[in-house]
């Protein structure tokens, strides 16, 4: 059963769980930050995503992501980075007091630290947003109920030269596939927002503050033979 994460009690629970990590992480330098916007779309709890512009340069163009970007020297901390980038990309101004806390940092292939910032942005119609077309092609929301359905969850094994490198979650059957670091951050958010409902299968992918809430399921088998494992996708 999906808990009422949009209630005042749900928000307070999440804030308390994230308080320790938030105090530590806000004081640390990072390369980038993203906002994880928890919203209500026609009364349904959802996470807000962007589809990066296909006109951008770099390997991540056209990927699903959360709004965010590199830290600027003028930013006070990672929270201000996430809020500034969200305003620039989506035209969405999120007050700092709507930030619930910081999730566990993730690291891109260049070992840069990316800090996810969870915020409650309230009722929202994604179609009413006017994103910056130079950075964003599309804005869409995925209900938490959709993300929590096992048929919409999978795992991608990344192999190179026949050798296993790593495995990451992937969320399927929405407007666009959610994968890579965005899927990892989504997994962290689900552990926090739906304790006992979402059970990650990857040891080590546990959100700060949710260590006692989610226990990884049985580890995945056959890392470089994902095609023989039901529900998995093989990444290259």
Swiss-Prot record:
Cofactor: Mg(2+); Mn(2+)
Cysteines paired by S-S bonds: none
UniProt keyword annotations, A-Z: Hydrolase, Magnesium, Manganese, Metal-binding, Mitochondrion
UniProt xrefs under InterPro entries: CoAse, NUDIX_hydrolase-like_dom_sf, NUDIX_hydrolase_dom
Function, in words: Acyl-CoA diphosphatase that mediates the hydrolysis of a wide range of CoA and CoA esters yielding 3',5'-ADP and the corresponding 4'-phosphopantetheine derivative as products. Hydrolyzes short- and medium-chain acyl-CoAs, exhibiting the highest activity toward free CoA, hexanoyl-CoA, and octanoyl-CoA and the lowest activity against acetyl-CoA. Exhibits decapping activity towards dpCoA-capped RNAs in vitro.
Locus of motif Nudix box: 70-91
GO biological process entries: acetyl-CoA catabolic process; butyryl-CoA catabolic process; coenzyme A catabolic process; malonyl-CoA catabolic process; medium-chain fatty-acyl-CoA catabolic process; propionyl-CoA catabolic process; succinyl-CoA catabolic process
Gene Ontology MF term list: coenzyme A diphosphatase activity; magnesium ion binding; manganese ion binding
Domain Nudix hydrolase: 25-172
Listed EC numbers: 3.6.1.-, 3.6.1.77
Species for this entry: Homo sapiens (Human)
Subunit structure: Monomer.
Catalysis performed (reactions): an acyl-CoA + H2O = an acyl-4'-phosphopantetheine + adenosine 3',5'-bisphosphate + 2 H(+); CoA + H2O = (R)-4'-phosphopantetheine + adenosine 3',5'-bisphosphate + 2 H(+); acetyl-CoA + H2O = S-acetyl-4'-phosphopantetheine + adenosine 3',5'-bisphosphate + 2 H(+); butanoyl-CoA + H2O = S-butanoyl-4'-phosphopantetheine + adenosine 3',5'-bisphosphate + 2 H(+)
Compartments (UniProt record): Mitochondrion
Lineage: Eukaryota, Metazoa, Chordata, Craniata, Vertebrata
Family matches, as SUPFAM superfamilies: Nudix (SSF55811)
PANTHER family, per the entry: MITOCHONDRIAL COENZYME A DIPHOSPHATASE NUDT8, NUDIX HYDROLASE
Main location: mitochondrion
Protein name as annotated: Mitochondrial coenzyme A diphosphatase NUDT8
Any GO CC annotation of this UniProt entry: mitochondrion
PTM-bearing positions, type N6-succinyllysine: 70
